[in-house]
Amino acid sequence: MTDFDGIIIGGGHNGLTTAAYLTRAGQKIAVLEATPQIGGGTSTEEPTLPGHKFNLHANFFMGFGHAPLMRDLELHRYGYSYIEPPVQQAGAFRDGSCVVIHQDLDKTCASLAKFSKRDADTFRDLYHRYVVEMRPLLVSLMYNAPLPLDQLTDRLSGPKAKEFLAHSKHDLFSVVADYFDDDRIRTLFTSYMHVITTENVPGSGMVFPGIFANVTGFTLPIGGAVAYPLACARIVAEGGGVVRTNAKVREITIESGRATGVILDNGTELTAGKFVASGIDTPTTVEMAGRELFETEAVEKLDNWHWGNHSLVTLHLALRDAPVYKARDFDPDIDEAFNIFFGMDDLDQVRSCFIDCEEKRFPDVLMGNGSCNSAFDPAYAPADGHSAFWWPFAPYTVDGDPANWDEQKKDYTSRILNVWRDYASNLDDDNVKAEFLYTPLDIERHTPNMINGAVRMGAYIPNQLGVNRPHPSLAGTRTPVEGLYICGSGVGNGGGMNGAPGYIAANAIVDDLRLKRDWTPVAAPEWRD
């Protein structure tokens, strides 16, 4: 007799998504998390002062309003909900100007038109195309196993589909430059395109439609990002399963070519009657199961997995008052914006930042985005305060050694805060009650499978995206090992807070085991115009 129907390795949001769906399919599930708390990239902590909550990783749940997860899992019943602030994004510049992106399309276009009427018209066209008209296609692409380009091309036809596919021939910078004219608008949208830490390399333009589709789809989890994994854990518990922390898996047991369970670091063996699914990084998963069980080409690629040229360094501030941005004189709505970009005033500065990251230097130009979550949900801070953060791009190895993040943390904190003060007028010592710098090295410590501070568990470059993430034999979450699945961010459509790998793996397991499901899978991608 086995201990569980299925075992999930890793208690991050993808592993728990798979667990919640399989629980709803009638399975008894065990989720095993190596660290003291579940959540992985969806964690919420109080690193500054009591009552000031910060999402250490995922904060902007992009496109979550269109994801099947809320509906299928009835997450509202288990404590998860979110808000969509009406003023979604903004870009502030040192000259005091700003661009503001609203959920109201006309207001957004009015903001853009202050710089370029043509760019405002272009934005309106792109909005109708990707945010509205092609949204169903983009959702289906996200929540189905990725297809090889030839198969995808067969399923998409017409002028709009042709334009959609043509993005994959270009890099992100050139795609943005082709669409927009004004330098500040180009600078903002180039920065926005890197919000998922995509590398600017040939072929990276393929992500443009999907990212643009979420330009007004940023959601904030009420009470903290950890509310999502906690909701999934409640579903698992309700179905008779367990979620264990401090349960590090050492080995995936294989018998007669089939995954049958796991062995923990302490020697405890747990058995699974039907499947094992891994939500941690793919290279480690392959090692735990046995390299010889996988295609040689896939193993070689994972041996040389590119974790990324840049990570993020986050300054968390416990404040008395929310930041007031100097650009409010240009457009007062900037103080209402959920996601604010600043630090970059032109494209040369954007390029400079990423060159410094690639060459492993602390950037001369600090640029990134952030938020004051407590301005939208009071649960993020005490009644007499606010919680704000800013996460500039930065390399994992800085000035020759990752340890420099620890040794020079005070200096880096001061430099980052001083840049923030260039844009916000009230971040003086009287307003800042406490500060906490969360570095790329801290990311790896907190979530060990984010190796080298890789917040996406692998760089977003063309040969590590879609069917190539990580390899065609693994991208769809199934593996060559019977009963073993990979449901983490290192496969298929993974790398952001979308639950897609977990969802895709759950559907694959249900299909393979011929289980009954109480949800309707997202339809396969198809487009004809």
Identify the residue ranges that each predicted region occupies.
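N-terminal glycine-rich phosphate/pyrophosphate-binding loop and immediately adjacent elements
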Residues: 2-136, 504
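Rossmann-like flavin
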Residues: 94-202
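Flavin-binding catalytic cores
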Residues: 116, 322-323, 358-363, 381, ...
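A glycine-rich dinucleotide-binding beta-alpha-beta segment and adjacent secondary-structure elements
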Residues: 182-196, 362-371, 426-492
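Helical element adjacent to the flavin cofactor pocket in flavoenzyme catalytic cores
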Residues: 209-263
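Mid-domain catalytic core of redox enzymes
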Residues: 220, 250-381
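Active-site-proximal substrate-binding core of FAD-dependent oxidoreductases
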Residues: 254, 512-529
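A conserved FAD-binding loop/helix module that cradles the flavin
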Residues: 489-510
